[in-house]
Amino acid sequence: MALTLRDVQQDVAKQTLKPIYLIQGTDQYLLDQVRSAFVSLIPDEDRTLNLAQFDMRETPLGVAVDDARSVPFFGDRRVVMIDDAYFLTGENPRTKVEHHVEDLIAYAEHPEPQTVLVIFAPYEKLDSRKKVVKLLKEQAAYLAFGDLTEKDVRSMITDKLRQNGFEMSGPAIQLLVRLTNMSLTQIMSELD
C-alpha cells in the first residue's frame, strides 16, 4: 500500500504501525525524517536492546531477518532497519556479502507482530520484475519519494516555518530554493 511521509508520521504518532515498511527515494532529508520517526518509537533506555540497524553492503540479509524474528527485550516493540537494500534494484555490486532474498520473502509472508521492519532503498527505481519487490510493494507499507517539484519544496519550507512560528514571503522562499539548488537537506539545515 502506497503512503506519504505524513501517513508514516501519523502511523508513528498514533502507534498504529504496519509490520513492514519499504522506504524508497534519494532525498537524504526525507530519508532522515523517516528514520528519526521510527527511532523515536523506542525509548532511549531500550534502544540498545530493541533497535537494530543493518547495512546490506556489510551484513547478510539473513542476519537482519533473524533479528526481526526475535521478540523485543523488556519493551513493547522492536524496530529493525535494513539500510541500502540494493538487492531490490538491478544493481549488482562487487561485494562479498551474500543475500538470500528468500529469507525476506518468508518473513514478509509471516512477520513478527511485535517487530517493525523498515527497509530503506535509497534509489530512484526498484526492479519491479523481482519477486521480492512485488511482494514488498503488496505486503509492506510503501513510501516512495519521487523527484520533488519546486512546489513540493516550497510547501515543505512553509510547513517547517509555520511549525517554528515563523513566516517568509513568497519571493524570499523562491530565492532560498534557487540559492540552494532546491536541495531540501541544505534548505532544512539553513532553517534550523
Question: Locations of the language-model features?
Answer:
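Conserved beta/loop motifs at nucleotide-recognition and modification sites
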Residues: 1-192
